[in-house]
Amino acid sequence: MDLERGSKTPPSSAPAAAAATTTTSTCCSNKRPQLRDRLVALQPVVLRAAATLATAVAAAVMALNAQSYTAVVAIVGTRPLTQTFTTKFRDTPAFVYFVIANAIAAVYNLVMLLFRCLILRRRMAGLVVHMLDMVIMALLATGAATAAAMAELGKNGNVHARWNPICDRFGSFCSRGGVALASSFTGVALMLALNLLSAASNAQCSPGQYE
């Protein structure tokens, strides 16, 4: 009888074990939504940080883009006369606009990252930021498209207008300009993704929630 009594499990141990198992499973299930919510919240931050880097690189590379080219223009006797030609981004208004647009976008995104905590405290601020993001994306797109058109003209020229290409003489200038254009178009794509994400987030909120 004593052995039988000792082998029996106390009645209170089974409910306690079940409660511990339930608590453990509940904690694990609660951690998963929290992790997912954190990853979703980090998406705009990552996109904006990448857009800041891309536009800053585009503005810096184009702003520092310059090259000199020396050519023989005449020969007097046996002495060649040379002339040095220099090209800079300031010589083309489209490239100047490109630098300004990318610089504005980089500064804007940096400010949004620094003051993100203050912006998230107000409900209406999300809609305002979304509208500003659309303006910056349009500014970036027009700047990149304008600079790309001028870059294509510099690379291939225009036979009908008798404009000769210059990239055969200013190869480094054109190469650095291509890097700046690629970085700027990357910034446009990132801003587009940021706008789509912001639009989806704002669509989940009803109009009555905005103050």
Curated annotation (Swiss-Prot):
GO terms for cellular component: plasma membrane. It is a multi-pass membrane protein. Residues 1-29 are annotated as: Disordered. It comes from the Eukaryota. Residues 77-94, 145-176 are extracellular. Residues 1-55, 116-123, 198-211 are cytoplasmic. Homodimer and heterodimers. PANTHER family: CASP-LIKE PROTEIN 1U1. This is CASP-like protein 1B1. It comes from Sorghum bicolor. The lineage of its organism: Eukaryota, Viridiplantae, Streptophyta, Embryophyta, Tracheophyta.
